[in-house]
Amino acid sequence: SNEEFAYLYQHGDLLTLGQAANQAREKRFPNNIATFIIDRNINYTNICSCQCKFCAFYRHEHDADAYVIDKDTLFAKIEEAVELGASQLMIQGGLNPNLTIDFFEDLFRSIKERYAITIHSLTAPEVVYIAKISNLDIKETLIRLQKAGLDSLPGGGAEVLHDEVRKHISPRKINTQQWLQVMRTAHEIGMKSTATMMMGSIDHLQHRIYHLEKIRSLQDETGGFRAFIMWTYQPGNNELMGKKISSLAYLRFLALSRLYLDNIEHIQGSWG
């Protein structure tokens, strides 16, 4: 329960929590099996109208280092990834007003024509923005992207699924219900996704537990989340700044997430 989660986070012994989480993992994957994916994150543009306070990545359209990736650069990055054994691409970027759905359909088709690789790409905020500037609804947008080669959605753009937090750190980004609805719609058309969380900006424990509750509830409804991935907020070079949350706090929350999200098969470590 939420109350048990809060109590154990505040008072539980970290090693005991870790052992309990490992036991939960072993029930799913006995014989000490752990899984991993080799993929590459490719950013197609750093031009973004969202301008989140925690972000050090975005640029304005006329900044000297603003870009939209060209296909030669894209294919070179994919070639490097394939040579290293990658089986998946995570293609993400800013909310660029010049990139309608046609850009992404062409991008995904060109990749699928050349490579036998999973396209795990576009976060919920990107999907909503693409739909908006292309005059489409969410379902039609996802169906068209799926037909073009999009296999699954990453969980980025969730940060913390509590609008009290979101209004402060990303006031121009979609709200909690919009993020959940994109995922629900993706699952309804047979497109799997992951769920994520960025902890440690201005959020508190009750915000994070609320976030997990929303994820678990949607998973009960659709069964469409393949994995949950969490990472810590990285202060510096952004408007929000602040302090970095401790590694022990991360491990404590990670262990409890394995116990709480009993309906999601994989808890994944972040590369970033």
Residue spans for each PLM region:
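Flexible, acidic/Gly-rich N-terminal and inter-domain linker regions that tether
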Residues: S1-C50
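Conserved short loop/turn motifs at secondary-structure junctions
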Residues: A6-L8, I38-N41, G93-P97, M199-I202, ...
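Canonical Radical SAM [4Fe-4S] cluster-binding loop centered on the CxxxCxxC motif
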Residues: A34-T73
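Radical SAM/AdoMet-radical enzyme domain recognition
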Residues: C52, S87-L89, I101, E105-M198
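Conserved alpha-helical substructure of the radical SAM core
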Residues: R59-G93, E113
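Short glycine-enriched, charge-decorated loop/helix-capping segments at active-site entrances
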Residues: D65, K167-K173, G242-K244
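Short, acidic/polar
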Residues: K71-I78, L136-R144, L212
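Conserved C-terminal portion of the radical SAM core fold
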Residues: E113-Y115, I119, K147-A158, Q177-E239, ...
